Amino acid sequence: MALIVVVLFLGGMFTQEYQRGTLVLVLTKGFPRRKVYTVKTMIALLMWTICFWISFGITWFYNSYYWDNGIVSHILPAAALFWLFGIWVLLLVVFFSALFSETSGVLAGTGAILVLSYVAAIFPKVQDFLPVKLLGVQELLLESTAVGDYGQAVLVTVLMSAAAAIAGMLLFEKKRI
């Protein structure tokens, strides 16, 4: 739920500036496009990281106070997997923000990639390689799987995140504003 709110909140981080013309002012003063893209991306990732871990900490302490957290194992790796999934989704948002000039295009592009990932996860041969596997941490929490079982999905997610970040930067450098 929180990730959906973050995507909706950050979906217009570039597109609103395209429409208002505020990026033109910054770029005509000589500020490099690469730095604008990098700073906006880093702020989005930092915001996700801080909000996620604060939320995790509050939930963890709340559950510890009222219930026993001893039944759950591998809680930090499970949280880190969901955090990494959020990083991937945010980098998709940034990529589509560099590609499209409308917030609806950004949200549609990000949603389409997520839906394709969910649909592809139906096929057993590829499901271990997809970023959506990182959302299946319930099995990890109940010790039905090991942390190492998520290694392929983590590697693919990191590579796809890096590709989205680099491609977004290249698109933003060439985009007419």
Over which residues does each language-model region extend?
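Transmembrane helix-boundary elements of multi-pass transport/secretion proteins
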Residues: 1-23, 121-122, 163, 173-174
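Membrane-interface elements of multi-pass transporters and channels
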Residues: 17, 61-69, 99-103, 119, ...
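Terminal transmembrane helical anchor/hairpin motif
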Residues: 111-177
